[in-house]
UniProtKB/Swiss-Prot annotation:
Subcellular location: Plastid, Chloroplast thylakoid membrane
Annotated Gene Ontology cellular component terms: chloroplast thylakoid membrane; photosystem I
Name of the protein in its database record: Photosystem I reaction center subunit IV
Keyword match Transferase: no
Protein topology in the membrane: Peripheral membrane protein
Gene this chain is encoded by: PSAE
Similarity comment: Belongs to the PsaE family.
Taxonomic lineage: Eukaryota, Viridiplantae, Streptophyta, Embryophyta, Tracheophyta
Signal peptide: none
Length: 19
């Protein structure tokens, strides 16, 4: 069910850049 609830990083790639 990963597709049902993907990680926040996948939804907001920009967040990864911020980290």
């Amino acid at each position: 069910x990963d597709e049902a609830a993907p990680p926040p990083a996948a939804t907001a790639p920009x967040a990864a850049x911020t980290e």
